[in-house]
Each structure stands twice: as C-alpha cells, then as structure tokens.
Amino acid sequence: MKIYIQPLSVNSHTVEVLANSLPKIFNAEVFVLPASDVSLKCYNASRRQYNSTCILRMLPPIKVTLGVTGKDIYAKGMNFVFGEAELGGARAVLSVFRLTTADSELYRERVVKEAVHEIGHVLGLKHCSNNCVMRFSNSVQDVDRKPVSFCRECASKIRY
C-alpha cells in the first residue's frame, strides 16, 4: 500500500512525524507531496474556519492521499472536525489545529491517532464503539483516551 501525504499549511515537523509513523502502522510506503496552502475557496470568513469537504475535494484522487493542515476545519453540521475522509474512497484530510499541545510526545500521539483514524475510513472502516482508534472523537480528551491501534473487529474489516 502507498500513502501520499499532502502538506497544506502545516509545519514540517508534523509531516515528519506522520512520514515516520505511518509506514510501521500500515506496512506502507509513504510519499510526501510538495507542500501547498489550503485554498481560500475553502475558507468561511464568518466561521473563521476552512470547510473540510472543500479541502478533501481538492486533494488528488489517489488512494491513499492524506491532506494534513494546521488550519481549523469544520464539516456541515459540526462546530469543528479533526478530519474527514471518503469512506472506502481515496482521500482524507486531517487538521492538527485542535491537537496542539506543549507536550511534544502527546502531540505526536494525537496526530498519529487521528491520521490512522482518517486512513481507516479510506480503507472502508466506519466509527467503532470498541476501545479502538476508529472510535469517534468529539474532543481532544476523546483522542487522548483511545488507542492508536485498531480493535480486532476493525482490523479484520480493512480493505487495502
């Protein structure tokens, strides 16, 4: 499997964390695409956030492409999201905006968990109620409580 990371207005340290972590988790080759900025077409000035669906649609439709941004993002009907993905599709987007903390190890864990979660959606997984990386996170505390790994049930359903 190949994973393409598309940096979108995000620091290089975050990209490096993912480029070093994802190959081990998914037994995948990881390629970092040239960095670019999030399109202003996706910006909602009244919310001061970027629309995650708009960003998702601007990513190359190559399975698996993970857009990673430092911008705050939202989806329709939500105050914010950590990410959005095409279920069983090719693309996902992850925002690290609300994952930031002074604790560098905790930041790394959060970023990796949410990247694995979004890639899990691309690989066909829905949200899970088990103690699993696919558990829905409504807050950063929810992210901190879940593991970085898939439960057995989810691991058996992954469609590479």
Curated annotation (Swiss-Prot):
Protein name listed in UniProt: Archaemetzincin
Known partners and oligomeric status: Monomer.
InterPro entries: MetalloPept_cat_dom_sf (IPR024079), Pept_M54_archaemetzincn (IPR012962), Pept_M54_archaemetzncn_arc/bac (IPR012091)
Cofactor(s) demanded: Zn(2+)
Pfam families the UniProt entry points to: Peptidase_M54
Record's keyword terms, sorted: Hydrolase, Metal-binding, Metalloprotease, Protease, Zinc
Domain of life per record: Archaea
Binding site for Zn(2+) 1: 117, 121, 127
Catalytic site: 118 (proton acceptor)
Cofactor note: Binds 2 Zn(2+) ions per subunit. One is catalytic, whereas the other seems to have a structural role.
Binding-site list for Zn(2+) 2: 128, 132, 151, 154
EC number of this enzyme: 3.4.-.-
Function: Probable zinc metalloprotease whose natural substrate is unknown.
Gene designation per UniProt: amzA
Gene3D superfamilies on file: Collagenase (Catalytic Domain)
HAMAP family, per database record: Archaemetzincin
Gene Ontology biological process terms, A to Z: proteolysis
Protein family membership: Belongs to the peptidase M54 family.
